[in-house]
Amino acid sequence: MSITIGKLSQATAVNVETIRYYERIGLLAAPLRTSSGYRSYTAQDVARLRFIKRGRELGFSLEEIR
């Protein structure tokens, strides 16, 4: 399974800019890139982002989730 950042955003209800932020701070691993430069996410990335989102909903800080 390989999806774009837009599809990842839709699947997890997390804003695209938030996903990019999580990548910048190392909370979400930098994805592979397609030959045209698009980010390409896996099912593992979807699961990780859902975990991060759930942790935030439960009141954990990003540092605690890390």
Predicted regions and their residues:
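Conserved, function-defining core regions and hallmark residues within catalytic/recognition domains
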Residues: 22
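Arg/Lys-rich, alpha-helical DNA-contact motif
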Residues: 2-11, 29-35, 40-66
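Glycine-centered, phosphate/nucleic-acid-interacting loop/turn motifs that mediate DNA/RNA or nucleotide
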Residues: 26
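The DNA-contacting recognition helix of HTH DNA-binding domains
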Residues: 16-18
